[in-house]
Amino acid sequence: MIEIKSVNKVFYQGDKQIHALKDINLFIPQGTIFGVIGSSGAGKSTLIRCVNMLEKPTSGQVIVDGVDLTTLSNPQLCAARRNIGMIFQHFNLLSSRTVFENVALPLELAGQSQQHIETKVTELLALVGLSEKRESYPANLSGGQKQRVAIARALASDPKVLLCDEATSALDPATTQSILELLKEINRQLNLTILLITHEMDVVKSICHEVAIIGGGELVEKGTVGDIFAHPKTELAHQFIRSTLDLSIPEDYQVRLQPTRVAGSYPLVRLEFTGATVDAPLMTQIARKYNIDVSILSSDLDYAGGVKFGMMVAEIFGNADDDEAAIRYLRENNVKVEVLGYVL
């Protein structure tokens, strides 16, 4: 459905070149919810704007439903964009128009009949759960309701693709979840291909089938959500996975942490478990095998793409050789171990 082939985007500031995208290659199948995640400035918003030619790539191809958008004239591109809906972090509703009139706007601009507009908008407002708000104005809506109006408006032309650029970033957690559930339902009902840009791994975990991770304008890693969470290959992937599990070090431990081992200290470790390692009794194994004690300060477990993953912060009590042997054993069994320091 969407093919991004060797896409590069360069911005110019005087004599300075800024490479926002570097040789990006992605394929997004029909009916997929595909997430692109990256930190601020990674290039993800530039990428999504290239998909509908709001930003024209410096080089490369963007093929949507078999049509290479980079080769189209302006009138042809305008017609092709009717197959691509888009929603943003900010809702961009017209304050002087009612909910009904905001959703109807693309249909009016396309020259549709009043009968078609009435039928279509009524159907869309029912889909997004806003039938009773049709005569309300944006000022009287919550943030979540405004985003629902924006979604209905984006679907007015029956697009085959919906682009979501940080669509939940301005919403509270409960409202974010309701919007994500709505997008999942729309994907199921309409078989709509959704390309979703976010900096939050929780959003990817909740809704996406596949994900690509972008850093510094480059494609760092891609795959199914289950594969990325079960077998992250890069440090950036580990960082985003870690962000979904909030395991901070207690303050009293932070002040006692030493960078190197000294007499009377013991290691404080952060362990990341993915895939099969989540269910393996590794902590009891190392306790018995190496004659050490393990004190778990905090732990968390979650699911993404049908795969369990978890994290733990723990203290290891033993002599230096046994501690190191236990850490090696965990790493040999595909547990990512980070020694945070040594508690004195």
Curated annotation (Swiss-Prot):
Enzyme Commission (EC) number: 7.4.2.11
A GO molecular function held by the record: ATP hydrolysis activity
Transport keyword on record: yes
Binding site residues for ATP: G38, S39, S40, G41, A42, G43, K44, S45
Domain of life: Bacteria
Gene3D superfamilies: 3.30.70.260, P-loop containing nucleotide triphosphate hydrolases (3.40.50.300)
Catalyzed reaction equations: L-methionine(out) + ATP + H2O = L-methionine(in) + ADP + phosphate + H(+); D-methionine(out) + ATP + H2O = D-methionine(in) + ADP + phosphate + H(+)
Pfam families in the record: ABC_tran, NIL
UniProt signal peptide: none
SMART domains: AAA (SM00382), NIL (SM00930)
Sequence ranges assigned to domain ABC transporter in this UniProt record: 2-241
PANTHER family assigned: AMINO ACID IMPORT ATP-BINDING PROTEIN, METHIONINE IMPORT ATP-BINDING PROTEIN METN
NCBIfam families in UniProt: ABC_MetN
Assembly behavior: The complex is composed of two ATP-binding proteins (MetN), two transmembrane proteins (MetI) and a solute-binding protein (MetQ).
Entry function: Part of the ABC transporter complex MetNIQ involved in methionine import. Responsible for energy coupling to the transport system.
Protein name: Methionine import ATP-binding protein MetN
